[in-house]
């Protein structure tokens, strides 16, 4: 819903000035934003066997000290993300694969809009992200639950906010 509200503002960004090209670093941020989950296609999370001792230690430290430190929280978030993709094997689901393929195609089409205008490029990248989230929502919700969906959408949207 936040993304839709954001998309409503994009057409209002028009100016009479000639379009300004994005810096490479900004384009890279947009690509990273949309490829958070495509990343897991080519790389796997650490196996839980290797990861578990670190997570156990982090949980023990947090329980003993009561301190909420970023590395501990980061480990827990990483653990949750790994469970979504390894325990539930969402990325192997035929329906989810079609979401990734559609997102990849939409990103490729957006790359084509780069030359015409920055606004068109950003609109298409947002459309690709919105399409991915809408497509993957019922799959992740059904296979992993609402907590997993909250985590996935939060990570994706927070990455988008870094750029925009």
Swiss-Prot record:
Protein's UniProt name: Uncharacterized protein ZK370.6
């Amino acid at each position: 819903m936040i993304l839709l509200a954001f998309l409503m503002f994009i057409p209002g960004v028009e100016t009479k000035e000639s379009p300004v090209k994005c810096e490479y670093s900004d384009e890279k941020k947009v690509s990273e934003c949309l490829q958070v989950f495509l990343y897991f296609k080519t790389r796997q999370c650490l196996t839980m066997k290797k990861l578990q001792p670190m997570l156990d230690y982090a949980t023990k430290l947090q329980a003993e000290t009561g301190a909420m430190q970023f590395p501990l929280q980061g480990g827990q978030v990483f653990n949750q993300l790994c469970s979504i993709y390894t325990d539930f094997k969402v990325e192997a689901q035929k329906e989810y694969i079609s979401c990734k393929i559609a997102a990849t195609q939409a990103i490729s089409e957006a790359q084509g809009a780069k030359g015409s205008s920055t606004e068109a490029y950003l609109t298409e990248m947002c459309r690709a992200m919105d399409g991915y989230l809408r497509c993957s929502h019922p799959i992740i919700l059904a296979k992993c639950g609402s907590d997993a969906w909250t985590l996935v959408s939060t990570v994706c949207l927070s990455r988008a906010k870094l750029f925009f």
